């Protein structure tokens, strides 16, 4: 089976303090992502203009899709999700070819 990449781009809401957002991101990773079946790795980055990307590698596409659904119900994800500008979110899943 091929691995899957979950790539999410977004902006954070105006007024959110960077240390608070980074703490919420760490809580999402430790309290949710790493506990999901098939989790392999996570890379979290930003660039100028308040643009962020969250890339998670999963063992399978099914693992990625299951985790995405579970995240919406997770109390560990809620603080970070609450700081994200929802209309800016773009989520994609890709099959890893190499």
Model features per residue range: what roles?
Residues 18-20, 52, 64-66:
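Short acidic, gly/pro-rich beta-turn/loop elements at beta-sheet edges
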Residues 14, 50, 60-64:
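Short, charged/polar surface micro-motifs in flexible loops or helix N-caps
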Residues 11-23:
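Short, surface-exposed ligand-recognition loops at beta-strand->loop->(often short) alpha-helix junctions
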